[in-house]
From Swiss-Prot:
Disulfide bonds: none annotated. The gene is pxpA. Forms a complex composed of PxpA, PxpB and PxpC. This is 5-oxoprolinase subunit A. It comes from Bacillus cytotoxicus (strain DSM 22905 / CIP 110041 / 391-98 / NVH 391-98). The keyword Hydrolase applies. It catalyses: 5-oxo-L-proline + ATP + 2 H2O = L-glutamate + ADP + phosphate + H(+). Catalyzes the cleavage of 5-oxoproline to form L-glutamate coupled to the hydrolysis of ATP to ADP and inorganic phosphate. GO terms for biological process: carbohydrate metabolic process. InterPro entries: Glyco_hydro/deAcase_b/a-brl, LamB/YcsF/PxpA-like.
Length: 252
């Protein structure tokens, strides 16, 4: 039987501001990435989100990003590998405190936004992230873009990479994600997104924007929880997998 992890970014509100419907999407995912206070999240939201994730028995990961609340961590920032290391250690440590306090165990780390995209093509940045994870807990998985620089980075630090693909994003011929500044970066048609996901999981391939066929064998699929129909889409993908004999579970 084919198995696949479904992950979602959660806890991305801040103070009085709420983004996404975390409660409604939790039943349809097997792992979650929780914002750690830099691009989104705050101590109260982090604690609440950790406790909800544990109640739903999903695996918990840290979702470190750039210290850029206004830009939601999606803006490129000129940083050194040492700064990236510090950012990631700080954020993993913050979330891990809440996970431990709630009686849980952290499962993985998945960088957010611009940090994620930079690491996918910049080996020094990817290695800084991998080193941070290794120095805190080398048993943690690293969730990173399939076919990217993350592969070399985890080999250097002997970590376990979970190769990730996106349900609602388009791809460039080199396997990178289409920038969110581009018109067709997001797939808004549900049927198209479902077809793309099944093609990736069942056939190990995906079509880039120009029609190029890319070989890809993802182990986890990212769902975005902040879209207008995010919950409906998450439920549909979950049920589509079940109907096609695909078992939804996080890496163990």
């Amino acid at each position: 039987m084919i198995s696949i992890d479904l992950n979602c970014d959660l806890g991305e509100g801040f103070g009085a501001y709420q983004i996404g419907n975390d409660d409604a999407i939790l039943p349809f995912v097997s792992s979650v990435n929780i914002a750690c206070g830099f691009h989104a999240g705050d101590p109260s939201i982090m604690r609440q989100t950790v406790e909800k994730a544990l109640q739903h028995d999903v695996e918990i990961g840290a979702h470190p990003g750039f210290p850029d609340l206004i830009g939601f961590g999606r803006r490129i920032i000129g940083v050194s590998p040492d700064e990236v290391y510090n950012y990631v250690v700080y954020q993993i440590g913050a979330l891990d405190g809440f996970v431990r306090a709630a009686g849980g165990k952290m499962h993985h780390v998945k960088p957010h936004g611009a940090l994620y995209n930079m690491a996918a093509t910049n080996l020094e940045i990817a290695e800084a992230i991998a080193r941070a994870i290794h120095d805190i807990n080398p048993k943690l998985y690293l969730y990173g873009l399939a076919n990217s620089a993350f592969i070399q980075a985890v080999k250097k630090y002997e970590l376990r990479l979970v190769q990730e693909a996106f349900a609602d994003r388009t791809y460039q011929p080199d396997g990178t994600l289409t920038s969110r500044t581009e018109k067709y970066a997001l797939i808004k048609n549900e049927e198209t997104a479902i077809h793309q996901v099944l093609q990736m999981v069942q056939e190990g391939k995906i079509k880039a924007m120009d029609g190029t066929v890319i070989t890809m064998h993802p182990q986890t699929i990212c769902l975005h929880g902040d879209g207008e129909k995010a919950v409906q889409f998450a439920e549909r993908i979950y049920r589509t997998f079940r109907l096609n004999g695909i078992f939804v579970c996080a890496p163990k």
